[in-house]
Amino acid sequence: MGASNLHTPFSTPALKVCGMRDPENIRAVAAIKPNYMGFIFWEPSKRFIQNPIPEIDPNVQKIGVFVKATPNFILKTIQENDLQGVQLHGGETAQDCKVLRDALDKEVGLSKPSLVIIKAFSVADQFDFSSLAAYEAYCDYFLFDTKGKLPGGNGYTFSWKLLSAYPSNTPYFLSGGIG
C-alpha cells in the first residue's frame, strides 16, 4: 500500500490538493508531487470524480473524500481506487470514526500500514477545540475548513487566529480559500 510516513507528524508543511477529477489535470498536479491528492466520492459535488483515477506517482498519497458514506461504501471505494486514506467531511461522530478505523484496520491487516483517516471540521467565527479529544484515538489528521453552504470546497477563509488555541498533538490541515 502506501508510504511508511503515513502517520508521521508534519515536520514541514504538507500539501494536499483536493477536488481532482480530470485525468490530464490529475497527472499534471501529481507531477509537482504534492503529499496528498484528494478525490471527491460524493455525487452532489461538482468535483465528484466519475472516471477511474489515473496512475500517479506512488509517493503522492490518494485520499478519498466522503460525506456521510457507509463504511462498506468507503471500503469498496478504497479497494477500487487503491486509496491510501480517507477524509470524512460529513458531520461524522467520533463513534463513526471508530467504526471506520476498526473496519480499515481489519481490512488492511498487519502486513500493511493502516490507512489514514482525516476528519474535517467546519469552522465559523469560533470553534470548540475540546470536541476534538473524542476523535484523537481514531483520526490521524484533522482538517479545518470554513463553514459554508456545502460540506467543503466553499472557497472561504476563516480567521486562522483561532488555531492559536489548538490544544491537540494531532497534526492538521488548513483548508478553505487558501489559493
For each feature predicted by the language model, list its residue ranges.
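Conserved N-terminal beta1-alpha1 strand-loop-helix module at the mouth
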Residues: M1-E107, S114-G179
